[in-house]
Amino acid sequence: MGVRAQQKEKTRRSLVEAAFSQLSAERSFASLSLREVAREAGIAPTSFYRHFRDVDELGLTMVDESGLMLRQLMRQARQRIAKGGSVIRTSVSTFMEFIGNNPNAFRLLLRERSGTSAAFRAAVAREIQHFIAELADYLELENHMPRAFTEAQAEAMVTIVFSAGAEALDVGPEQRRQLEERLVLQLRMISKGAYYWYRREQEKMSHHSE
C-alpha cells in the first residue's frame, strides 16, 4: 500500500472512530452530523466525501465493523474453551467484556436492528445471521446434532444474549454480574433442552423403525 493509500485508510479509520465516540445512551446514529464527525476526525467536512458517499455509508461500515468485532471475540472465546474453559460461562463473560469495552458498537447494532432505515435493518440482520450461523456450526461440530437442531438452538441463544446485552448497557458492575449469572443459567437450560429434545426425537424414530 502506497503512502497516499495508507493516509486515506488512516483518515477513514479516524472518521469511523469519531462517529463511534459520539454515540451514547442519549445519542443515536441518526442524530450525528457529518460536520461534527469530520471535526472530531480532524478533517474538513468537504473531505468526508473522499472516504464515504454519505453518512449512511459510514453507518453501514460501522454496523459491519461492530458485527465483525463481536464475531472475532467469540471465535477467541471458542479458542479459550478449547484449552479447557466452560463453554457457556466463557462465551458469556467474553460477550459481556465486549459490551463493557464497546458499548457504542453494541448500541448501534441494537438500535439499527429495528430502526427506520431498511438498509441498516438488513445490515444488522445479516450480522446477526452470521453470528447465529457460526454458533450453529460450532454446536453441530461439538454436539453431533443435525443442522436443523443446532440452528434453532443457536437462534434461541443469540436472541437471549442480545436481550441481556441490552440490559447490561444500563446497569452497574454488581447488577451486570447478576445478569451474567442469569444468562449462564438460561443458556444452560436451552442447551440441556436441545439435547434432551434431540434424544427424544431419536428414540421416537428408533421405535418407529422397529
Curated annotation (Swiss-Prot):
UniProt domain HTH tetR-type: residue ranges: 10-70
SUPFAM superfamilies per UniProt: Homeodomain-like
Residue ranges of the annotated DNA-binding region, renumbered to this chain: 33-52
UniProt key word Cytoplasm: yes
GO cellular component: cytoplasm
Membrane-spanning parts: none
Record PROSITE patterns: HTH_TETR_2
Entry's localization field: Cytoplasm
A Pfam short name: TetR_N
BP GO terms, sorted: fatty acid biosynthetic process; negative regulation of fatty acid biosynthetic process
Keywords assigned by UniProt, alphabetized: Cytoplasm, DNA-binding, Fatty acid biosynthesis, Fatty acid metabolism, Lipid biosynthesis, Lipid metabolism, Repressor, Transcription, Transcription regulation
GO MF annotation list: DNA binding; DNA-binding transcription factor activity
PANTHER family: HTH-TYPE TRANSCRIPTIONAL REPRESSOR FABR
Subunit details: Homodimer.
Xref: NCBIfam families: PRK11202.1 (NF008402)
Protein name: HTH-type transcriptional repressor FabR
Originating organism: Klebsiella pneumoniae subsp. pneumoniae (strain ATCC 700721 / MGH 78578)
Lineage, top ranks: Bacteria, Pseudomonadati, Pseudomonadota, Gammaproteobacteria, Enterobacterales
Gene assigned in the entry: fabR
